[in-house]
Amino acid sequence: MAKGKDVRVTIILECTSCVRNDIKKESSGISRYITQKNRHNTPSRLELRKFCPYCYKHTIHGEIKK
């Protein structure tokens, strides 16, 4: 029997520097990654360093709402 809330949830990580530099219009989009996290181990928002193809470097990607 399954419980109401799953422990492992799917989240979206979005590049924080692309969002801040939206005024420049140098980048043609916003880098997003889809991953999973365990609610019990990481109850706060997740931030990971991932490669952004629009910034051409490794930047911090933060968790966003769906």
UniProtKB/Swiss-Prot annotation:
Family (UniProt): Belongs to the bacterial ribosomal protein bL33 family.
Q: Which UniProt keywords apply?
A: Chloroplast, Plastid, Ribonucleoprotein, Ribosomal protein
List the Gene Ontology MF annotations in alphabetical order.
structural constituent of ribosome
Localisation:
Plastid, Chloroplast
> Which HAMAP family does this chain map to?
Ribosomal_bL33
Annotated organism of origin: Olimarabidopsis pumila (Dwarf rocket)
Q: Which PROSITE patterns match?
A: RIBOSOMAL_L33
Protein name per its UniProtKB record: Large ribosomal subunit protein bL33c
Q: Name one GO cellular component term.
A: chloroplast
Main location as per UniProt: plastid
Report any one BP term from Gene Ontology.
Answer: translation
The protein's matches in Pfam families, at most eight in alphabetical order, are given as: Ribosomal_L33 (PF00471)
